[in-house]
Amino acid sequence: MQPLVVIYALLAYYLSRMGCYSVFMALQRPLTVQQLSDKLTVPVVDLLLPCRFCSRFLTYLELRQFDYKNLQLIWTDEDFVFACCSGCAYASAQFEFQQYYQVTLYGREIEQEEQRPVGQIYMRCQYCLKSLDLLEKLDICCSNQPFHKVRDHWKGRCRHCKAIE
């Protein structure tokens, strides 16, 4: 065993005896692929992260897209880590839209509904789940495109999915 692993295991054991282990692990869990790569000192290209939904390992491109979309790693109580592949992200977005759709607003109506500027409203792409940036939100507003409320969260179309259609 490597010395760091032994020290980490001893620290985890000590903290678990004190009832602090869950707090310790919560502070230590990386939320992005890059943070996980840095913490493990393993290049991203060498990471093997399974998809939580289909159990397939994400490709290098999918690992990079995962961080680009501002998605977060999924940790289990047993300290297993999962991500979400692109195919499952699209399927999940489609499923949520079909099952939990609430309302559609066009352009700047969203600001009136939420009582705050569009730049302060968090939203994701309705197709790929990418977190929308300010330019994407403003583009949707200016072109009078739809915003959809799904499961109490706003969705729009990102520049990549817009280019595909």
Curated annotation (Swiss-Prot):
Cellular component aspect of the GO annotation: host cell cytoplasm; host cell nucleus
Keywords attached to this entry: Activator, DNA-binding, Early protein, Host cytoplasm, Host nucleus, Host-virus interaction, Inhibition of host innate immune response by virus, Metal-binding, Modulation of host cell apoptosis by virus, Transcription, Transcription regulation, Viral immunoevasion, Zinc, Zinc-finger
Presence of the UniProt keyword Iron in the record: no
Molecular functions (GO terms): DNA binding; zinc ion binding
Compartments where located: Host cytoplasm; Host nucleus
Signal peptide: none
Major location category of this protein: host cell
InterPro entries found in the cross-reference section: E6, E6_sf
ZnF region ranges: unnamed: 51-88, 125-161
BP-aspect Gene Ontology terms: DNA-templated transcription; regulation of DNA-templated transcription; symbiont-mediated perturbation of host apoptosis; symbiont-mediated perturbation of host ubiquitin-like protein modification; symbiont-mediated suppression of host innate immune response; symbiont-mediated suppression of host type I interferon-mediated signaling pathway
Domain of life: Viruses
Stretches of the chain forming a coiled coil according to its record: none
Role, per record: Plays a major role in the induction and maintenance of cellular transformation. E6 associates with host UBE3A/E6-AP ubiquitin-protein ligase and modulates its activity. Protects host keratinocytes from apoptosis by mediating the degradation of host BAK1. May also inhibit host immune response.
Family: Belongs to the papillomaviridae E6 protein family.
Protein name: Protein E6
